[in-house]
């Protein structure tokens, strides 16, 4: 077993735990920065270690296309290639393939697609994506699944569940024949139909995965449906395994995920928003492109202890964004990931102290408001 619960909130499903990945221990709930192509944009491995991150995410689709498995095999995996010394999770690449629209085609045992880079043709199967992730050398591998659009009707959702469940069974059989130190997580689907969700959760939970992931949420559905599905499944999840909510990284969404028993999160939003001039602070979201910060000599967040806020004024960082300097992206990204790390630590501490709902209300109030304007 790779997961152990260490404390539980008495009023919600929130909990803390320890996730053990080949000797690397992580406290949960945990947020994973996204390094799609083998790097968290604008940051080095040293930066991530300085920020005390121990788990990041890579993307199988992109790493398969470039640099490719032959390069990864030669280096002994992505971690040696990139000198990342901590843990790595890779998604299966299925979501990216299905986002290609006309460039992919379902088959019984996989999906054919054309590269978005050069139009070359490729074929992903449940087995092949495990092989690719073995070349990548991730500590957690994700199975190939079929994520239907959130507004799909019953027929399309049924197709999604049938594929997802069939591919999950194939993945488990293949993985168990050639087990190594890599862990495998299953993914359940069902869109915003709670009956389909519970059916899929039951099927995926019945298989011997190391962890269970919620797929196909936060893909454009109304927020009330996002909350409804989380609430509806929370009483039915396996509390002996880690629960991973894929692609979720806003402050309100993380809070609602934790409230409903989620242990793991990933999202490009903190890094992407940083590059677009939005930073997360203890006062709320701030738009660095706002004219009002032009001459401000205060830090982006007066309560922040990161090296960026200790050294630079918000006026200076706004200037760097305004003139398009690359350094603006790295400084803002560093700050946002520092914020996320502290935010998750505060959540962990609040659960252990029995104060989660107080923290929940505090951050919800701050982050469901418009941007902070001083």
UniProtKB/Swiss-Prot annotation:
Substrate binds at residues 91-95, 145, 189, 216. The keyword tRNA processing applies. The active site is at residues 91, 266. Zn(2+) binds at residues 304, 306, 309, 335. It is an enzyme of class 2 (transferase). GO terms for biological process: queuosine biosynthetic process; tRNA-guanine transglycosylation. The keyword Transit peptide does not apply. PANTHER family: QUEUINE TRNA-RIBOSYLTRANSFERASE CATALYTIC SUBUNIT 1. Homodimer. Within each dimer, one monomer is responsible for RNA recognition and catalysis, while the other monomer binds to the replacement base PreQ1. Belongs to the queuine tRNA-ribosyltransferase family. This is Queuine tRNA-ribosyltransferase. It comes from Leptospira interrogans serogroup Icterohaemorrhagiae serovar copenhageni (strain Fiocruz L1-130). The lineage of its organism: Bacteria, Pseudomonadati, Spirochaetota, Spirochaetia, Leptospirales. The gene is tgt.
